Amino acid sequence: MVLIDSSIWVDFLQSGHEPQLVQLLGLQEVLTHEMVLGEVAMGSEDQRKNALQLLPLLPMAQVADHVEVMALVDRYRLYGRGVGYVDVHLLTTVVLKPGMLLWTRDKRLRAAARQLGVAFMPVLH
């Protein structure tokens, strides 16, 4: 399963073109997260409308609690690296679920996901 970050959803909702995401959706390999839904819903009116139609239909990843998030931050020294609290929530969710990966275009979040061995690496076309 792949947890899709808001950076991927925003690009997809704007362009409608993300072949690998379409493929993952068809294979039912996509998860969303309540914080991703919230972030994407804060975009433009059209983006918000599309996000609120699509994302709630997808399986929702279990949300990590604050203690789990902070433990991951401390264990992997994720502070001071430009990775935000929402980002660390996504990382924690993925780390706590073996086999789950995180797909993002955010450079710092992707670097942290790589460090933790949970980065989804799309096939380039």
Indicate where each model-derived feature is located:
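Conserved nucleotide-sugar phosphate-binding/catalytic loop shared by glycosyltransferases and other
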Residues: 57
